[in-house]
Amino acid sequence: MTNTKQKINAVFLSALMVMSVFAAAVAFSGAAAAANRGAGFTYSTGPTDSNGGGNGDSVGQVGPGAVVFQGEEDLEDGGNFGSNTDIGQLQKVSGDNSGILLGNPIPQDQPTGSYTFDGNSGTDGVTLQTPRVTSVEVQNGGSGDVTGSTLQTSSSGPDAFVRADYNFQEAEDLEITVEDENGLEVTNEIVVQKTGLPTADRNNDNGASGSNGDFDVGWELDTTDIDEGQYTITVEGTEDLTFGDASETVTVNITSDQQASLNLDNDEVVQGENLQFNVENSPEGNYHVVLVESSEFRDGITADQASRIFRNVGDVQEVGLVDNTGPVSASTVASNVGSDQEVADVTRYAYGVVEIDGGSGVGSIETQFLDDSSVDVELYPASDSSNDGYASGGSHASSVTVRDTDGDGTDDSEDAIVTDLLETDDDQSFDVVEGEITLDSPSGAYITGSQIDVNGTANQGVDQVALYARDNNDYELIEIDGSNTVSVDGDDTFSEEDVVLSQGSKGGNSIVSLPGSYRIGVIDVQDADLDSDGTVDDTLTTSDFNSGVSGATALRVTDTALNGTFTTYNGQIASDDGQIDVDGQAPGKDNVIVAFVDSRGNAAAQVVSVDDDDSFSEEDIDITSLSEGTVTAHILSSGRDGEYGDTGTSSDSAFVNTIETGYAGGSSTGDQVREQILANTVDDTASDDLIVNEQFRLTDGLTTIESVSSPVEANGTLEVQGNTNRVPDDNTITVEILNSEDESVTVESTDEWGSDGQWSVNVDLSDVDIEPGNYTVEADDGDNTDRTSVTVVEAGSLEEEQPDTETPEPDTETPEPDTETPEPDTETPEPDTETPEPDTETEEATTEASGPGFTAAIALIALVAAALLAVRRDN
């Protein structure tokens, strides 16, 4: 029984296996048929490939040289791939994944590249690519791209298209799917059936309509009965290729509203900032006019500036001005402006024409030419009808032209501007608030005549600023390096370096040339041109200055100053050197004069420049033309007026020549030359000159030895000190130790000493083979010498005498016994020399035992000593 049951089970299982194999064969053939590559016009919502219907190459077979795509399934071997007839066994040729099998179906992430039957380049195989829908565009009836934007509903049948490019035409068709904003598929309702077939295939399907244009494929849309809202359009492969880049989704807003809208980026801007705006909800390719009335213009602007209120950027195609005759050039407006008129008095509007491109029209407004108030921007409708008389097609400015409204056959000032006859599509307002300008420098204190940096910050849109100073009344212009204005850089900062505020021909320069406390400010050039002549005004009232975009700060102006010193050595300059150094500070000056006068009336002078930090320094000034003796040295400054005394001379070099060849050119004594210098500078009438006076001796070079550390041990250090009037660095003092035969034992030197002329040299004898004895120390500066003697003793001998110097303490500790016995010391000198020991012993005993009972013992000893002394006296 068991045997029979097992046999029945075996037969049953065998039958199942046969049926399953048959079913698999049927399923495979069905799938292959369903996966024909690019097969046909069976897809009512998509095109066929370029091979055309019924072409055998468009079925699922793939032969050598074919292009296949990631994600394709059920490919058939349609050619000879060498010994391997299974396409899935093709091997990758090169790269990191060389040798891997292609697979069938092909994985969606299979590495792209060449695959051949043996994995070698040049043999039979296929090329694997990534399937891509490269572009999807929704277009209106005017072929304008409204992808992601607005598509107006049609009133006369199909008038919109979806067009696409893709790269897998050889594999399968594209399919379009449209969903409304609720996710409901409405493809059949909006897509015209069988549209967008490539031109070569149109004759194969009489139901095809529409055009693919410059794209690979196209579908025609009929929006006549479509609800308003946002629609999502997906274009992808019809079967296998619906993933990744093979699927592309876009959106479009379908609306029946014919009224455009205007959106501003901000509802408040600082005067000078650019304000961006967008014209939306209008068909692609339309033109709209935007206007700002002339009453919004800023006072003082030029006609050219007014014509640029709407910037010619983005989608703006045209900008300009409108008067009662229509569009008018800026030059004509400028000629029409009277002496007491503003540009706003002879114009109606500033306008811009904006094209709808890519779903919207983008423009920008230059707010620096608008008043700081609330500004209205008006948007007018667009039309394709030439009879409407406003912007359309190439006639961009037609909405601001004049229409013959009085019927006299002439467009003139008696007629109306077209925009006056139209209702606006939209209007928006924004507030222009006054900006700020900050003056960072100068501020605080300023020394008249000195160089200073002028810098600060300004709001966006301020191109130039002007600097003004105020004493008690109006603001007066400050000229800066010959210019009345300072440019503002792209980062909204302005800067001028090394400016002398007191130099210039304007009233502000004159104000800051005198000491005092003032206001200094900076203002937008636009607000400083009150008469609109294109240049800033020399004078502004406080009200005019404060009402503009401006900023001010306090400035304290101080007078020029002078201080300095000459470098001498021990109050002298050696005639052997014939040079002297000077340094100091002269804030507010570019140059000073240094002058020298000797007792015989000779003079030497030269100009010394002052650095940006107000300091000056000059080395090696030549004074060899002066006679030895007392010399006076002077530093001269021409003061804040830049003129020496009342001479009318402002040239430093000219005054130097006057000193050397005028005052010192005759038989004048030194005092007379000095009197002339003073009389024509600091002592002159109403002079503001400054002077620094010093005195030194010009004499022969001299170097002396003042002290040596003698005696010195043979292994010790000899310290030599002295004075000199020579200039360090340029001279060297050499110290040499000479033996009794004037032979050199060792040499040291120095070239460093201070203005007191004191020099010092240490001579190390530890490494010198020198015997105890007397030697000569010589100091030599190259021109002058001085000598002194020194004693060298045995090494360590000075240290042996050290105990003698260490015994002062015992002497100071026993003063009382010495003072109590003066008479015995003088009368009996011999016993005195014998008695110190008992005294010191008694002292020690006293300090060592100071308890009760010792006092009586000491007294007894004292009595015995007194008795003995009396006996000795009797003898």
From Swiss-Prot:
Residues 797-846 have a biased composition (Acidic residues). Asn-455 is glycosylated by a pentasaccharide comprising a hexose, 2 hexuronic acids, a methyl ester of a hexuronic acid and a final hexose. The complete pentasaccharide is first assembled on dolichol phosphate and then transferred the glycan to the target Asn. Cleaved by the archaeosortase ArtA at the C-terminus, with removal of a short hydrophobic segment. Its main location: secreted. This is Cell surface glycoprotein. Residues 137-158, 197-217, 380-414, 794-852 are annotated as: Disordered. The chain crosses the membrane at residues 851-875. Keywords: Cell membrane, Cell wall, Cell wall biogenesis/degradation, Glycoprotein, Membrane, Plasmid, S-layer, Secreted, Signal, Transmembrane, Transmembrane helix. Residues 137-157, 383-402 have a biased composition (Polar residues). Belongs to the halobacterial S-layer protein family. A motif (PGF sorting signal) lies at residues 852-854. The keyword Cell wall biogenesis/degradation applies. InterPro entries: Csg_halobact, PGF_CTERM, Surf_glycop_sig_pep. Residues 205-216 have a biased composition (Low complexity). It is found in: Secreted, Cell wall, S-layer; Cell membrane. Pfam families: PGF-CTERM. Residues 1-23 form the signal peptide. GO terms for cellular component: extracellular region; plasma membrane; S-layer. Glycans are attached at residues 253, 455, 563, 715, 774. S-layer protein. The S-layer is a paracrystalline mono-layered assembly of proteins which coat the surface of the cell. The keyword Protease does not apply. GO terms for biological process: cell wall organization.
